[in-house]
């Protein structure tokens, strides 16, 4: 990849989804992940209809549906009595109205689906063991400084490293 790439700091679901979305629009990207390997971590996440719509656009909607556990309702319960305070049915009527289901899926399943997409795309380069330390904006370009590696130049930078991000702190 060259300096016409969009740089993405963070190889989690957000960073990989950003890379996949950019590839859908024909943009090259370089994903820089601090971890020495991309492994299955995390727990369950809730996916609303809008998330399924996004995953469909990114080409991993079928994977989301295949790995999802569909729930009948969302329940807000009193912590002391355990009684329902409110209940939102998530049945066929909900799915028809929203165009997609509401479900729960393991984070690792979605991460793997997005990672597979990114690895198989000629527009995306994924680099592990690349801790983004800081960046510099230079006119129409950005330079990303990686710990123990040469800096990487690109058109723009997306910070997707999470709450303890060096890039987030600098921005």
Where are these regions (language model features)?
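N-terminal Rossmann-fold NAD(P) dinucleotide-binding loop
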Residues: 15-16
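Glycine-rich FAD pyrophosphate-binding loop
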Residues: 23-43
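Conserved N-terminal helical subregion
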Residues: 2-6, 23, 52-171
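Conserved N-terminal glycine-rich FAD pyrophosphate-binding loop of Rossmann-like flavoproteins
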Residues: 36-56
